Amino acid sequence: MDMNVNIQESTKTIAEDFVTLYKAGKADEAGERYWADDVLSIEPSGSMPPARGKEALHKKGEWWEGAHDVHRMDIDGPYVNGNQFIVRFTVDLTVKETGARMKMDETGLYTLKDGKIAEERFFYSHN
């Protein structure tokens, strides 16, 4: 079997399980299972500094959950290409600090190395 096919299938398996856990409300478990120890998380320029390592990503997730009331989250994907996959998050939320309700359309690009997520990079728009 072609090495690229093996990578694609391995990525597909990991990505599908990662998304299944997210859809079940188990984002922390998904991260703990699939983030590399030195995982790097990058938000769009200027929104927040990059975070590195599982502990930093858990803290980032705790901050996000504490700062927002999520009314609805739809998750589409994964869409796999080689050692990467994309997940689309459509979120209806209220920012707790301001009370502003908004819809956010976010795409996460996840890159695997040695069967773990080495980088997650996010792109989004909101209104």
Residue ranges and their predicted role:
Residues 8-9, 16, 28-82:
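A solvent-exposed, acidic/Ser-Thr-rich amphipathic alpha-helical stretch
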Residues 35, 91-93, 108, 123-124:
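Short beta-strand segments enriched in hydrophobic/aromatic residues
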Residues 71-73, 88, 102-108:
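Short, surface-exposed coil-to-beta transition loops
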Residues 1-24, 33, 55, 116-118, ...:
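Terminal "cap-and-tail" regions of soluble proteins that handle hydrophobic small molecules
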Residues 105-127:
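Short beta-strand edge/turn micro-motifs at domain boundaries
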Residues 82-91:
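A short hydrophobic beta-strand element
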